[in-house]
């Protein structure tokens, strides 16, 4: 998959850090009319998700919010989340903060990310790499720690620029039976540290982050790492992703959602910074990080239909089609990897914020089941 080096600080109902169903156990602010609405509040979270390689992910966390004197948005938002994956047998922890000062619209962000779930497979480099051996051959046990301070500045309504330094450290275990060990050594394996700069431009006009029916989103991000710490040759990475939504009815009874993304690395990039395609976030129906290259692209389409407005919530069906590939300098390939499938979705109390989707995607290699809050995009 395209691993997000820049992990945006998400509002908790659709938790980008846990990638799970975030169930708020305390009520949300329904209005700002009473004095109680402006008091600091701490909300506990509980989550669960499923994908074929990582399997069941169980998570919990809290979000703490403070307001200025009768002012929106909040002056402080703190988030702490932890999750454990039963299939990968490892964890993910995220601590994040958003701080705003009175007056200027600038947001000061801080994020600490520690995880063993960012890179779990390695099939070699290439768009037609072999995947016929037992799954244990391709497994990777890597722990990553990311420290990411940044400043976000609004450029226009719904258009934001984020930039700052970053520090990243990874430790990859040398398991002798894996492809990573038998075909290596690979630059970046073992202990590897890197520092650099990052920037991101984000345009978001969607009407809902978890289950959009209208609007669009465009994100362009870049990172650059000089020859410092473990980095021998400077390298950079750029990625872009765009999605749009068209619906019929109000509220929507049918929504066509399409998304496309691409990424590329330049210079002496370590193996964990290559472009990966395949898995729950790019091309479903394939293993996580199934294909690795210097450049990559993917596209997704979903047709989401409302089937019934039951008393407890909306029930619907979804059809999907995914496609993607990677490019490497020493390989000539015209293959695009595709998958298709469908599933069900449910919006509790008729609120799209409360949407849960369960889909199956079939590719030439396997069929995968995916459970998540909202939709993929």
Model-predicted regions and their roles:
Residues 2, 30-118, 162, 172, ...:
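Outer-membrane beta-barrel initiation region
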Residues 46-50, 78-84, 97, 108-127, ...:
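Transmembrane beta-barrel strands of outer-membrane/channel proteins
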Residues 50, 54, 134-168, 190, ...:
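Outer-membrane beta-barrel transmembrane strands
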Residues 73-75, 92-95, 120-128, 173-180, ...:
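Outer-membrane beta-barrel translocator domains and adjoining extracellular loop/strand segments
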Residues 81-83, 132-137, 182-188, 224-230, ...:
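Extracellular loop and loop/strand-boundary signature of outer-membrane beta-barrel proteins
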Residues 83-93, 109-145, 262-278, 356-360, ...:
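Outer-membrane beta-barrel translocator/channel fold
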Residues 198-199, 342-346, 351, 366-377:
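Outer-membrane beta-barrel "beta-signal"
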Residues 246-328:
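Extracytoplasmic gating/loop element in the C-terminal half of outer-membrane beta-barrel translocons
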């Amino acid at each position: 998959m395209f691993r997000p080096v820049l992990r945006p600080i998400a509002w908790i109902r659709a938790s980008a850090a846990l990638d799970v169903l975030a169930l708020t156990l305390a009520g949300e602010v329904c209005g700002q009319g009473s004095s109680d609405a402006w008091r600091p509040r701490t909300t506990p979270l509980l989550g669960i998700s499923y994908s074929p390689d990582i399997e069941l992910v169980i998570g919990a966390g809290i979000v703490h919010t403070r307001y200025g004197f009768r002012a929106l948005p909040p002056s402080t938002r703190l988030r702490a989340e932890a999750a454990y994956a039963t299939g990968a047998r490892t964890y993910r922890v995220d601590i994040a903060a958003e701080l705003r000062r009175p007056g200027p619209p600038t947001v000061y962000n801080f994020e600490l990310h520690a995880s063993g779930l960012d890179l779990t497979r390695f099939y070699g480099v290439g768009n037609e790499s072999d995947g016929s051996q037992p799954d244990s051959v391709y497994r990777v046990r890597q722990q990553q720690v990311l420290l990411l301070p940044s400043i976000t500045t609004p450029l226009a309504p719904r258009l934001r620029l984020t930039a700052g330094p970053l520090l990243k450290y990874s430790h990859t275990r040398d398991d002798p039976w894996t492809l990573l060990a038998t075909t290596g050594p690979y630059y970046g394996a073992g202990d590897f540290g890197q520092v650099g700069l990052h920037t991101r431009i984000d345009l978001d006009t969607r009407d809902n982050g978890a289950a959009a029916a209208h609007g669009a989103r465009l994100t362009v991000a870049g990172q650059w790492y000089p020859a410092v710490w473990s980095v021998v040759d400077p390298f950079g990475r750029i990625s872009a992703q765009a999605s749009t939504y068209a619906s019929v009815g109000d509220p929507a009874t049918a929504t066509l959602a399409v998304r496309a993304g691409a990424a590329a690395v330049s210079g002496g990039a370590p193996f964990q910074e290559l472009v990966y395609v395949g898995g729950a976030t790019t091309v479903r129906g394939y293993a996580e990080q199934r294909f690795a290259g210097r450049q990559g692209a993917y596209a997704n389409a979903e047709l989401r239909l409302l089937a019934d407005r039951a008393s407890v919530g909306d029930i619907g069906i979804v059809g999907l089609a995914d496609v993607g590939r990677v490019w490497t300098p020493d390989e000539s390939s015209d293959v695009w990897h595709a998958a298709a499938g469908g599933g069900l979705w449910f919006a509790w109390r008729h609120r799209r914020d409360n949407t849960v989707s369960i889909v199956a995607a079939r590719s030439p290699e396997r069929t995968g089941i995916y459970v998540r809050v909202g939709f993929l995009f």
